Amino acid sequence: MPYEIRITRQARKDIDTLSPKLRRKVHDILVNLIAEVPHEGKRLLGDLAGSYSVRLNLKDRIVYSVDEKRKVVYIERARTHYGD
């Protein structure tokens, strides 16, 4: 059963700034990867420990966390997480 996807305000703002091509890619990743197998992303360390990321392009990533108990994935960011 797929996980529910919830997008934070910040992630929505990030997605709105992306090109149409990257927005389609975000949608495909959310539906086909993250909702189905959320732990396939890269585990993050440091300030973002406990979160995961999936690459959009060379610079940008989707950053998300998983609530296993509720079967919900929270999309936190959809841009770089490297401080740019």
Residue spans for each PLM region:
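Enriched for short, Lys/Arg-rich terminal
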Residues: P2-K13, T17, K21-R24, H39, ...
